[in-house]
Each structure stands twice: as C-alpha cells, then as structure tokens.
C-alpha cells in the first residue's frame, strides 16, 4: 500500500509542474497587461511600473524567478490590491471557499448516496420515480440558474434565509449557496449509486447471502454497499473539480469573499499574479484530491494497486 501511495505522489509532481508551466506562459503571453486600463498611463510611468514588477525582463527570466518564488511559498505581489500580497489575499479568502466547498461536497455525498440506495431498494416504485425525477432535473439545471431561484423563493418571497453575505460562515448564510452548489452533484451521485446498487443486488454473492437467510439490512450494509460505492468514489474527483469551479459563480452571486470571487475579480482586472496563483492552487488541490480518491479506491478494491 505504501508503494502505491508513493507512486501516486511521484506521478503528481510532473503533473503539477506542467500545470505551473502552462499557466505561467498562458498568462504572460496573453494580450494586454495589468496596467493597461481605461485610463492610459504615460509610457515612462508604465515602463517604471513594469520594471518594478520585472515585467520587462525576458520571459524565461520571469519564469525561473517565479519558480524560485513558488519554492519558497511566495505567490508574489498583487497588481490590483496594491497593499496586499497574493498570499495575504489567499489566506483571507481560502477558508471561506474551503468551508463552503467541504459542506457542499459532504451534502452531495450524504444525500446522493442515501437517495440512490433508497431508489435501488425501491426499484420501480414511487420512491424510485421520485428520486430519478429529481436527479434528472438536478442534472440539467445549472447552478447559475438554481442560485437566483433559491434567492427569489427563500430570501425574497418567504424571507426565511439571507440572500447573500457570509457573516463569518454562520449556518443560515451558508444554506442557500451550499444547496445551489451541491444540487447537481446530489443528482449525479444518486443516479450513479442507484445504478451501481441495482447491479450489485443482482450479483451472485448477494443471492448466496439471501439464500443463507441473512437479514436484508446486513446484506446491504455489510456486503452490497461497499462494492456499490466504487463508481461513486470514481466520480468524486470530477465532482470536487466541479464544486471548485462552480464556486466561482456561486460566490459571485451570493457575494461571498472566497477564492472564486477573488479569481473573477483578478481576471477582470488582469491581475496576472493573482489569477496564476489561484489557478495553481486549485490545480494542486485537484491533483491532491484525485490522489486521495485513488488511495481510497485502492483501500476498498486492492486489485487497483497492481
């Protein structure tokens, strides 16, 4: 098992390096600069600013300097927020996105798996049709449509919940963005769990367990659930990426001070160092999470190690 974990870690290093390299050159070769806005600066002022941030250095010099910065954990200065470094901005916004993303992910897994298992056990009944109807609806409606609808219903019409803001991560401020962010993944996980559970329940080893007279509850939780969750586990990697990218829209709609909104503001203001750093951070988290999923998959199904 340790050998498998080490192999996955070693595989992640070149992937992260390629991500950093591609992201850096795409940002540096993009047209415009952080200092070309609606108000044109005099050429000498622009030259002095670019010299201050070493933007007029050869691109390979900038690249190796950036790698050296990253090796020391320094994301560099922000071009838009002059009084803060990128590290300061990330440190302030990352806990918001992490809390929202973790809550949405857990909600999607818990409700999605539970609904999928119920639908499989109640196949071709009212319960099954209800879950699958919800799943189809949740998959086709994007989060940027769900989010304002939730605000209109629960914040404006019923006035049960606030329609935006963070307020230190209080639960009532998290409910609407958490539901909007997780709804599509609840639906997808429910569909995957249902299909996988139905397949497992028709397996020979489940028939054998039933023939031995084992209680249905024990058959489900001791024998059927574990193999049925393997496809769900495979889906968790893409789901995690989707929740991270989806948070950019959700945080903007609900006015949450997370890395999603920070990324959007950085992109609109051409803040190269901020956008590049957030891209690398999200990419690194994605690589890390996929590696964790692979390890969990190997724990459940030892055949995957070889």
UniProtKB/Swiss-Prot annotation:
Gene Ontology molecular function terms on file: peptidoglycan peptide transmembrane transporter activity
Entry's localization field: Cell inner membrane
Residue ranges annotated as Periplasmic topological domain: 31-101, 157-165, 251-277
CC terms in the record's Gene Ontology section: plasma membrane
UniProt topology in membrane: Multi-pass membrane protein
Coiled coil: none
Superkingdom, natural source: Bacteria
Segments on the Cytoplasmic side according to the record's topology features: 1-12, 122-133, 189-227, 301-306
Domain ABC transmembrane type-1: 94-293
InterPro entries in UniProt: BPD_transp_1_N (IPR045621), MetI-like (IPR000515), MetI-like_sf (IPR035906)
Knockout or disruption consequences: Double mutant oppB-oppC cannot take up cell wall peptides.
Induction of expression: Part of the opp operon, which is constitutively expressed.
GO biological process: protein transport
CDD domains associated with the record: TM_PBP2
Subunit relationships: The complex is composed of two ATP-binding proteins (OppD and OppF), two transmembrane proteins (OppB and OppC) and a solute-binding protein (OppA).
Similarity annotation: Belongs to the binding-protein-dependent transport system permease family. OppBC subfamily.
NCBIfam families reported for this sequence: PRK09471.1
Functional description taken from the UniProt entry: Part of the ABC transporter complex OppABCDF involved in the uptake of oligopeptides, including the cell wall murein tripeptide L-alanyl-gamma-D-glutamyl-meso-diaminopimelate. Responsible for the translocation of the substrate across the membrane. Plays an important nutritional role and is involved in the recycling of cell wall peptides.
Name of the protein this chain belongs to: Oligopeptide transport system permease protein OppB
Organism: Salmonella typhimurium (strain LT2 / SGSC1412 / ATCC 700720)
């Amino acid at each position: 098992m340790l050998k498998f974990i080490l192999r996955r870690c070693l595989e992640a290093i070149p992937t992260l390096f390629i991500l950093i390299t591609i992201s850096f050159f795409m940002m540096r070769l993009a047209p415009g600069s952080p200092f070309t806005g609606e108000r044109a600066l005099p050429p000498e002022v622009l030259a002095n600013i670019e010299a201050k941030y070493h933007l007029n250095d050869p691109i390979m010099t900038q690249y190796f300097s950036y790698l050296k910065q990253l090796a020391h954990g320094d994301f560099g200065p922000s071009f838009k927020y002059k009084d803060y470094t990128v590290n300061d901005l990330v440190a302030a916004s990352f806990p918001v996105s992490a809390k929202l993303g973790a809550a949405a992910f857990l909600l999607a897994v818990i409700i999605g798996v539970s609904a999928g298992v119920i639908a499989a056990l109640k196949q071709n009944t009212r319960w099954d049709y209800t879950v699958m109807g919800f799943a189809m609806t949740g998959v086709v409606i994007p989060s940027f449509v769900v989010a304002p609808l939730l605000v209109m219903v629960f914040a404006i019409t019923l006035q049960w919940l606030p329609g935006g803001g963070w307020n230190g991560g209080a639960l009532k401020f998290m409910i609407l963005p958490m539901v909007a962010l997780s709804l599509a993944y609840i639906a997808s996980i429910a569909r995957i769990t249902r299909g996988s559970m139905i397949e497992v329940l028709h397996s020979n080893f489940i028939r054998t367990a039933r023939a031995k007279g084992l209680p249905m509850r024990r058959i489900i939780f001791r024998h059927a659930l574990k193999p049925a969750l393997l496809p769900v586990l495979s889906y968790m990697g893409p789901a995690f990426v989707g929740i991270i990218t989806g948070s950019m829209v959700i945080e903007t709609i609900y006015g949450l001070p997370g890395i999603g909104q920070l990324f959007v503001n950085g992109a609109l203001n051409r803040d190269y160092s901020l956008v590049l750093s957030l891209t690398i951070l999200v990419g690194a988290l994605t690589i890390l999470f996929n590696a964790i999923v692979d390890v969990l998959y190997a724990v459940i199904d030892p055949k995957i190690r070889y």
